[in-house]
Each structure stands twice: as structure tokens, then as C-alpha cells.
Amino acid sequence: MINKGKSWRLATVAAALMMAGSAWATEYSASFKNADIEEFINTVGKNLSKTIIIEPSVRGKINVRSYDLLNEEQYYQFFLSVLDVYGFAVVPMDNGVLKVVRSKDAKTSAIPVVDETNPGIGDEMVTRVVPVRNVSVRELAPLLRQLNDNAGGGNVVHYDPSNVLLITGRAAVVNRLVEVVRRVDKAGDQEVDIIKLRYASAGEMVRLVTNLNKDGNTQGGNTSLLLAPKVVADERTNSVVVSGEPKARARIIQMVRQLDRDLQSQGNTRVFYLKYGKAKDMVEVLKGVSTSIEADKKGGGTTAGGGNASIGGGKLAISADETTNALVITAQPDVMAELEQVVAKLDIRRAQVLVEAIIVEIADGDGLNLGVQWANTNGGGTQFTDTNLPIGSVAIAAKDYNENGTTTGLADLAKGFNGMAAGFYHGNWAALVTALSTSTKSDILSTPSIVTMDNKEASFNVGQEVPVQSGSQSSTTSDQVFNTIERKTVGTKLTVTPQINEGDSVLLNIEQEVSSVAQKQATGTADLGPTFDTRTIKNAVLVKSGETVVLGGLMDEQTQEKVSKVPLLGDIPVLGYLFRSTNNTTSKRNLMVFIRPTILRDAHVYSGISSNKYTMFRAEQLDAAAQESYLTSPKRQVLPEYGQDVAQSPEVQKQIELMKARQQATADGAQPFVQGNK
């Protein structure tokens, strides 16, 4: 048996669907009489192609009819309005699904947060964050709750620290409340009071009043920090400018009047013990600062000599005590505060820079000297002096040996000759063949390093002083000659001035020099003293901390061939080698200089680098000690581990322990430590 009431409702729904189908595709008409709310929701979802989830608590009958054709947006708003009338709301989800819940549950659901660009319309459930500039939200929120449906889906919450309102409800209601807030939130701090100070400093007064006002707000005051009165100092006229609400301005003005009183003393004196800076150098900086302060206070003027100035009716004096590295300053309180800030910013630990240089030099040289010399007893012959064994000298030394039996001449010739020499004679002819091949290799690696302060020049010098004859003078009374000797330093020199820039970059002004005494004298300078090999680089580079860059280098290759020969005879193929001397020399030299700066900003980094260097040096000592024989070498002294105290005698160790005990007793606030007699 079919229920007649239910059949009538189904017929009504069918008629409504037929009416909707007969309209345009984007227009709808609705007519529901005593229809179940679930059927109404399902019909709307089908027409709008929306998936709708219905909460189980959504139940009831509805009666509604639309006489006009509605477009899709109007139809959706009509749907929301009907649900609002019956105490329900729609919550859109991220995936496009709609959820129908009771209105009082909607405000705790994931409803969208809107703003001025898209505030929402109609009966959509939205949340709006409204900033308030001139009125306390604590006082405004209760008024708005009376205009909102707090029993349903509406809600008004205030947040004091940011002075904002969080309004939740139907979009039309929320927009109306936002408009109410805008009209109520009128600027109430346009009035300004200017207080001319007679004795106190405007800057110091503003700092004091601001701190007091801030403390009052943080202790639970009703006024938000955004609504607190604003206090600004006008240093030019030594005035305080106050703006805000009338009551707040009156309280600030009264406070300023009470503080702006004449002090009994015209100044005070303080002693600043510096931790890092040098008091004597800082005095000059503070004198310049005091000059600027006086110009600001008086509108121009000059300071008295010696760092004294008359500022604000009082004397300003700045001096340094070098024995304690302290500054003694006498000034008015406001000036003292400014100078104290300057001292605090100047007396800081300056960064240091570790500069490590690597100097690499590789040199190779090869030489070949071949020569044949002839002599005749009747006179004549060929002789080449570049062999360091001329045949004429050999003949004279041989004749001296044959006639007198002395070998002095031959010994002197042998001292200056290297290589092989072979000779023979037949009849009146004699021949001398000399041959010499040389090969030299040299690898030099130097790694000087130095630590210096930022913007402080430092130098490093390791080498020896070589005596060089600079002149000579004959005596007027005798035949003696007096030579003047100077000392020239040779070795490794490093002079550097680092400047730390922004972003851990270091500008290095570097002067690098590596010098040594040449093993081979330049031709024709044997009587003039030693010859020096010098490599110098003077440069300025910008390097990032920890990076290694090349400063400069040299790649040099020289090939030299010297031929001494008898004209015509020395040019004969093959046989010409018997009438000439050939000297071939080839040399190569590669020189590179690298640099690496490292910024040391704190003691931990400095200690870590020192520990690494110390440990590496100690490891070399241990390795050398392990390779030495206990029978041939005495026991090598090795450095203790890094951070470990050097062994002391028992008496010294006892005194150190007593000193540590006294320091510990003083730090713990105990009774003074007294050593008793035993």
C-alpha cells in the first residue's frame, strides 16, 4: 500500500524537476512543499553536479518556493539561505565536495578564510581576520558578539598582541560586522603634544618613558601595544613629542614633567676598563665624537683643548690611564650614555687572519763540455780556456815536474778542474782531451705562515746575514787596505697587511721575497763578492677566507751553446771536433707562489689551528726520535701533548696547586685560604 502523502511529495519533486528541465540550461526554479530536507539537498546536488555529504543530524521538512528563474550562482545562494533558515550550513572541502552540518558545528569546521579581495557573499560560512588600528579589540569584541549569531555558526574572537579580530559566520553577516569595525576604528591619536625640556636630554627621556610604558603594557594592562602612546625625541630642539589617546598623553606628559628637573650635580665621572682596545688610541676617537655631540647640542661650536668641552652647561673631559688601560670620562648623563655606547661598540674583539704562503721552486740544469787542445814543443798549438785546464799551463807544470820534480803546478791545475782529462804526446806533438757532463736538480718548498690582526701589518723573516764587501780604503801611513763589510739578509721574507671585508673576503697587501746566495758566480764577478738570487712579489689580492690562490709565478728555460774553435780547421766535418771546444748548457726553472688566508673570529678557531700546527710539529719530532739510534744519538727532547702542562719541579707544582686553591676559594665565596705551618 502506497502512502498518499509520500506519493504527493514525490509528484511535487517530479514537477519541480520538470520545471527545471523546461528552463534554460543555466537557470533553475525550485518549489518544495513539506519535502524531506535530504531530498531537497540531493536535488540541488544533482542540478549543480555537486557531491554533497549530509551529516546524520541533518533531518526535517522544508517548505520553499521560487517564482523566478535563478542562474547557477543564485540557485546555490538560494540553497544556502534555505539551509540557514532551518539551522544548517554548508562547508566546502578542498576536493570540491560539500558537507552539510548543523550551523553551530560549522564554525569549528575547515571553513575558508577570506579577505577584502574575495570576502564571500550571501550565506557562505567564512572566517575573516580584521586588523584594528586605533581601538582596543578587547573592548570592541563584546559589542560585535551582540550583532553576530553566536548561538549558531557565528563567533568573534580577539587577539590582543596583534590587536586583530577573528570573525566567523555567514558572509553577509561577517561583511556587515567588518563595516561596523571600519566605522568604529577611527583614528584617535591625531592630537600631538610637544614638551620642551629644560634639563634632561630628549633622547634619554624618550628611552626611559618608552621602557616604562612597555613594562606597564606587559604586566597585563588593558591597552594594546599598538595603541600605546607614541613618544619621539626631537634632538634639535631638545623636545619630546607625544601622540595618542587623551588619557595616555596626559599620563606621559605628567611623567615627563616630573623627570625634567635640575640635578644637584652638573656631571658625573665614570671609568671604563677596556678589554680589547687601547685606551690611548680610543681617546682621540671619543674627542671627535664629543665635538659632534657639542655641535648637535649647541648648533655649532668648538671644543676646548685636551679633550674638554662645555656641553649642556657641564664639563666634558676624556683621558686615558695607560697603566690600567682604562678611560676616565666626565660628562652629563645624556652625553655619558652616548659615549658609553661608542665605547661598547669600539671595545670589541678584533678578528685575526692566518696567512699561509707556499713557495715552490723546481730547477733543472744539464751541461756538456768537450774539447781537444794541441801543443808543439817548437812553439804553437791550440788552447781553450773554457775547459778550466788549458794545455799551455799543463805543459809548463809538466816541464817543472820533469826538471825539478815538483808537483805544485799540477796540483794547482787539478783544483780548478772537474771531469776527465786525457793526454798523449808523440815526437814534438802533444794533445789534451777534456770532457765534463753536469746535471743539477733543485726542489725548494717553503711554507711561511703568520697571524696578524685585521688591518695590522705583520712581517716574517727567516734567513741568514751574508757579509758583503761594500768598499775599501787604503791607509795613508802604510800599504794596508781596510775593507768595509756590510751584512745582507737572505732567506724568506713575508710582509702582509690583511683587511677583512664583507662576506668573509680578505684584501691582502703582500710583499713576498725569497733570496739565496747563488752557487755559481756570474762571469767576471768572482772578485766582487757573492751573487744573490732574489725572487720578489709585491701585490694586493682579494681572497675568500680558506681559499688558496696563486700570487704569481715564473717558468724559465734557457739553452746556451758556446763553441771555441780554430778557424777553417774547426769547420771540417768530423775532423773539426779535434780543433774546437764545445760547451752546451740547458737550464729550466719553475717558480710558483700561493697564498691562503683564514679568518680567526673567535678563540676556539684560533685554538684549533694552533693545536693542528703543534700536533704536526710534535709528530715530526716523534718520527725523528723513532728513527734515531740510542747508541749513536742522545735521547731527543719531544714536546708535550697540546694543552698539557710542562713538567715542573715539585716545589713549583706545589705553589701552582696552592694558587689554584686560593682562586677556587675566592670564586666560591668561601673563607680566604690560609696556608698553615707544619
Swiss-Prot record:
Coiled-coil ranges per UniProt: none
Signal peptide as annotated in the record: 1-25
Membrane-traversing stretches: none
Compartment(s) where it occurs, according to its Swiss-Prot or TrEMBL record: Cell outer membrane
Region (N0): 26-122
Cross-referenced Pfam families: Secretin (PF00263), Secretin_N (PF03958), type_II_gspD_N0 (PF21305)
Stretch list, region N2: 189-264
Presence of the UniProt keyword Protein transport in the record: yes
Matching Gene3D superfamilies: 3.30.1370.120
Keywords linked to the UniProt accession: Cell outer membrane, Membrane, Protein transport, Signal, Transmembrane, Transmembrane beta strand, Transport
Site (May serve as a pivot that allows opening of the central gate for substrate egress): G463
Residue segments, region N3: 267-347
S domain, as annotated region: 604-678
Chief place where the protein resides: membrane
Region ranges (N1): 124-188
Any single Gene Ontology cellular-component annotation: cell outer membrane
Biological-process GO terms, alphabetical: protein secretion by the type II secretion system
Region feature (Secretin): 352-602
Comment text on domains: The N0, N1, N2 and N3 domains are periplasmic, while the secretin and S domains form a channel that is partially inserted in the outer membrane. The N1, N2 and N3 domains each form a periplasmic ring. The secretin domain forms a double beta-barrel structure; the outer barrel has a diameter of about 110 Angstroms while the inner barrel forms the central gate with a small pore in the closed state.
Function: Involved in a type II secretion system (T2SS, formerly general secretion pathway, GSP) for the export of proteins. This subunit forms the outer membrane channel.
Family as reported in the entry's similarity comment: Belongs to the bacterial secretin family. GSP D subfamily.
Assembly and oligomerization: Forms a cylindrical channel with 15 subunits.
UniProt protein name: Secretin ExeD
Organism: Aeromonas salmonicida
Lineage, broadest ranks: Bacteria, Pseudomonadati, Pseudomonadota, Gammaproteobacteria, Aeromonadales
